[in-house]
Amino acid sequence: RDYYLALAAIYSGNLETARDLLQGVKMRSGTMPAEYADLLIDALEDPARKNEIAGMVVNATKTGELDKLVGFESLLIIGSPRAFDLGIDPVSDVKNLQLHAQIWNNSAVEFRQDPRFKEWVEELGYDDFWRKYGWPDRCRPTGPNNFECI
């Protein structure tokens, strides 16, 4: 419950409350270590530090200090396309469907605009689904075999 409240606090701009709620919270993918909760809020408070902090999260997952899916979800919270650097397979690695939903949050615009996002969409089959049943608000076709998302 605290995780969802922390996300609500982030989306409403109440970052100090979010900082408190994220400390050691159980996320969709695992537990958020307190020091990384602080870093994520630091990145949201100071966007100039976002890429630096994203790099710290990526490095922590590569050394095993931070679980890969926790790192991935953390990078989604700050909207960093560096989440792709973790080599997460959207089909075999991401079992929690709610984690898939997080890619559509307002904070994930940069993530969706990264060229690697198209590969994800295609691997998941979303593009074929959208062509058949209609496009979501955040994506649109740009040609017979191409699309963009915001």
Which role fits each region the language model picked out?
Residues 1-150:
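Alpha-helical protein-protein interaction modules
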